[in-house]
From Swiss-Prot:
The lineage of its organism: Eukaryota, Discoba, Euglenozoa, Kinetoplastea, Metakinetoplastina. One of its GO terms (biological process) is polyphosphate biosynthetic process. It is a multi-pass membrane protein. It comes from Trypanosoma brucei brucei (strain 927/4 GUTat10.1). Component of a polyphosphate synthase complex that utilizes ATP to synthesize and translocate polyphosphate to acidocalcisomes in epimastigotes, insect-stages of Trypanosoma brucei. Catalytic subunit of the vacuolar transporter chaperone (VTC) complex. The VTC complex acts as a vacuolar polyphosphate polymerase that catalyzes the synthesis of inorganic polyphosphate (polyP) via transfer of phosphate from ATP to a growing polyP chain, releasing ADP. It is found in: Acidocalcisome membrane. Residues 586-595 have a biased composition (Basic and acidic residues). The gene is vtc4. This is Vacuolar transporter chaperone complex subunit 4. PANTHER family: VACUOLAR TRANSPORTER CHAPERONE 1-RELATED (PTHR46140), VACUOLAR TRANSPORTER CHAPERONE COMPLEX SUBUNIT 4-RELATED (PTHR46140:SF1). Disruption phenotype: Is considerably less virulent in mice. Reduces short chain polyP levels and results in accumulation of PPi.
Length: 793
């Protein structure tokens, strides 16, 4: 079977020897017995017990592997405190064997980065192993529905994913320590390169934001691969030392901190609809607060905590203004009075004056506070929705040129429309919905045509990120919780597509996809498209993305093993003789550990081994080499009565989510003008041909045509005119087909060529041939007798 072959190709041999995988072959034998004896109730029990036992073994292995990776990352983080500015050759084994001792040695930044890459590589291999086990269990349960009479019934089958849940083993702490290591390495390299330290992280920046941002969905299986691409370049940005806090409290560490927002709208959801329509000046008003890190109660808010009053205004490009977000802070106890219009802003102004704020800043504050309050009262806005998530931000201090945020555990909660006479609902029984993916937002501050960093281009184009432009938590929450009501006239384009599988293992790399597939449907359209534009792959990868390579080294596994053995060696030495120096320790122990440290030859496996196996055996859920429809339309579901804004949604190559596109009218007008030019010339040729047929006279041919057959002498003008009409009709058909093919390509907005490859070439050669033949005929008539010496030439 394809999955069986793909599974054998996807496993890591070294992990398999350690018992890291569900044994699919043994489980498949049980499934075959179930298929042969379909009514035997004992077989599902046998399968369940077998899966549970194997999951227990895998969970134990995952637990030990996470501890090993944490030990490695912690040792590297301690060693990164002793980075040297000089790239002097160092024995890494000696450095890591002395970590934590008084004789710790300095580590060059390049070696620290190399070890961090090795740990990242092993961590991603662990994630791939875990994901393959999940895919295996899902495949087994799916086959049970085919072979068992009633399928996997009972609560135990529903909860099998919760038993020995290896996904619950957090790797956030490992990513945090690796982020710290990369940050130290980048700081040392920056000091050596520029002679000055970089901007410290965690510094509070401006409160006015003006960025271009792109949002992506990331499946939770693929999130570690995205984080691993970010931390070598951007450190985790936090306002508090959450890692130290988690150690003090004895609670698990998480990369993100809770963020909650309460959105305001009226009974008819006016702001929601204006936001979806992308009207110029569309406004969004919300109250946002930042929860305490590591606190399980995200709704907890004390009276002295700050709540930010925020307003977001959308502006179209033609208006000359940029969309912006502005905000100011109030204490929680003052929010209700502010919304009612009973709060005096004089104390806030006095506080600004005490901080030596300029008159312009004071005026901006008053203008913003008045604008938000005016809109709340003018549109009768009420609290309608609350969004909550864990946000991890990656940014280099005050440098906001690149900022990446990752929102996980996103949930949307219904508010009470102000019935409690409070700015937010404090009850615990509100309707709630969880968003299935992580939301990654890449925020850039750069000029329109400025080239961004290659690693950013590689990240934005990798298959782990599913681009969903203009994704809005507020729009998603309203459509999810209120989409069935008659007040919602339209829903966002992504709502009918939430069930699409966006896992990276089920789709090829963007730059490896043939962008011409799927544009045309039917044999005729495909044939004409390939005749006009060719069949070769287009350049779908940007120059910057092609320059960036993730984990380019080929010795990551060997480096990992060497450092791991050095750390174990140091731990053993410290446990045997903690008070002895390395020179005083027995030589027999040194020799024994040196022998244990000798490495066997290792193979560098790919971190995307599972994806390559799925690709080789065509385990994609969609047809990758056939033709899908160009447009997506909703055919059912609870949003069937609502309009999917806006209209038909074109299919973007290599991506699962189809995104509405905006088209520049000049693009389509240029294509039409191209067709009109060809049609104009074809019409002239056709009219001349018709005139030759109607008014031509073959009797007026030159005297040297007298010897021609009488039929051709009588009908030469008809033949000539007919040929001209046929040529004109062919040119008209060609112009129309080219126009339609180019329009489809413009509509699909793909990175492929729009130019006509064969038409101009053929036209050029035809004109050259006509000119050459004409010149040759005139030369032969005038100089032929002289050159040949014959009057009959």
């Amino acid at each position: 079977m394809p999955f069986s072959k793909a599974w054998r190709s996807a496993v890591y041999p070294d992990f398999r020897e350690q018992g890291a995988y569900i044994n699919y072959k043994a489980t498949k034998d049980t499934l075959h017995r179930m298929k042969e004896d379909i009514a035997n109730p004992a077989t599902p029990d046998e399968l369940y017990n077998s899966l549970l036992m194997q999951k227990a073994t895998v969970y134990k292995w995952c637990e030990n592997k996470v501890k090993e990776l944490q030990m490695m990352a912690e040792a590297l983080m301690k060693a990164s405190d002793y980075l040297s500015e000089e790239e002097t050759p160092t024995n890494m084994s000696m450095v890591f064997s002395m970590v934590g001792s008084s004789e710790a040695k300095y580590l060059p930044p390049s070696d620290a980065r190399r070890v961090a890459d090795a740990i990242t590589y092993e961590l991603l291999r662990f994630v791939e192993c875990r994901n393959l086990n999940t895919d295996t269990i899902e495949h087994i349960i799916a086959r049970m529905y085919r072979y068992a009479v009633l399928g996997p019934t009972g609560d135990r089958w529903k909860n099998i994913n919760k038993e020995y849940d290896y996904h619950a083993l957090s790797i956030d702490e490992i990513f945090f320590m690796l982020s710290k290591v990369y940050e130290h390495v980048n700081e040392v390299e920056s000091m050596r390169r520029d002679g000055r330290s970089s901007i410290p992280c965690g510094t509070v920046g401006s409160q006015v934001f003006d960025r271009r941002s792109v949002k992506y969905w990331v499946h939770m299986q693929d999130l570690p691969f995205v984080i691993a691409r970010i931390i070598p370049h951007l450190p985790l940005s936090t306002f508090q030392d959450t890692y130290a806090m988690s150690k003090e409290r004895g609670v698990p560490f998480t990369l993100g901190s809770p963020i909650s927002s309460v959105y305001y709208d009226n009974d008819k959801f006016l702001l929601y609809h204006r936001r979806l329509e992308r009207l110029d000046g569309a406004t969004l008003i919300r109250m946002r607060w930042y929860g305490r890190p590591l606190d399980s109660d995200w709704n907890k808010l004390e009276s002295k905590d700050s709540v930010f009053m925020e307003i977001k205004v959308h502006h179209e490009a033609w208006s000359g203004e940029r969309s912006n977000k502005r905000r100011f802070a109030l204490k929680e106890k003052d929010v209700d009075a502010y919304i009612r219009g009973d709060l005096s802003l004089k104390p806030a102004l006095e506080k600004l004056r005490s901080k030596n704020a300029s008159e312009a800043e004071q005026e901006k504050f008053m203008s913003l506070a008045t604008e938000i309050l005016t809109k709340i009262h003018a549109y009768d806005l009420k609290p309608v929705l609350r969004t909550q998530c864990q946000r991890a931000a990656f940014q280099c201090g005050l440098d906001q040129s690149i900022r990446i945020s990752i929102d996980t555990d996103l949930r949307v909660v219904a508010e009470d429309f102000g019935l409690s006479h409070h700015w937010r609902y404090n009850g615990a029984d509100a309707p709630l919905s969880h968003f299935p993916y992580a939301v990654v937002e890449v925020k850039l501050q750069c000029a329109e045509n400025e080239r961004i960093a290659p690693w950013i281009e590689e990240l934005m184009n990798c298959r782990y990120m599913e681009s969903v432009p203009k994704f809005s938590k507020y729009a998603h929450g309203i459509a999810t919780l209120y989409g069935h009501t008659p007040f919602i006239k339209m829903v966002p384009y992504w709502m009918p597509q939430l069930d699409i599988d966006i896992r990276a293992s089920t789709k090829p790399e963007y730059n490896q996809w043939d962008p011409t597939i799927g544009i045309a449907s039917g044999c005729w359209e495909r044939t004409t498209d390939r005749v006009i534009f060719g069949t070769g792959h287009a350049q779908t990868q940007t120059v910057g993305a092609s320059e960036a390579r993730f984990l380019p080294r080929t010795d990551c596994l060997r480096t990992y093993q060497r450092v791991l053995k050095a750390i174990k060696r140091g731990a053993h030495m410290n446990s045997v003789a903690p008070t002895m120096s390395p020179t005083d320790r027995p030589p027999s122990d040194e020799k024994k550990l040196t022998e244990q440290q000798e490495l066997a030859p290792v193979v560098q496996y790919d971190t995307d081994r599972r994806h390559k196996a799925y690709t080789a055996f065509h385990l994609y859920p969609y047809c990758e080499d056939g033709v899908e429809s160009l447009c997506f339309t909703s055919t059912g579901g609870k949003h069937v009565a609502a309009e999917v804004f806006s209209g038909l949604i074109p299919w973007q190559t290599g991506k699962r989510i189809r995104v509405p596109q905006k088209y520049d009218p000049k693009t389509l007008l240029t294509s039409e003008r191209f067709m009109v030019k060809w049609a104009e010339q074809a019409t002239r040729v056709g009219v001349v041909g018709l005139a030759v047929i109607r008014f031509g006279n073959s009797m007026s041919l030159p005297n040297d045509m007298v010897a021609v057959h009488s039929f051709w002498r009588a009908n030469f003008h008809i033949v000539l005119g007919s040929l001209m009409v046929v040529v004109a009709e062919c040119v008209l058909v060609y112009a129309y087909v080219t126009f339609k093919s180019r329009s489809r390509r413009v509509y699909a907005r793909r990175k492929i060529r729009y130019d006509d490859r064969r038409g101009p070439v053929a036209l050029t050669f035809v004109i050259l041939a006509v000119i050459l033949i004409t010149v040759m005929m005139h030369v032969m008539v005038r100089y032929g007798p002289m050159l040949t010496g014959s009057d009959t030439f």
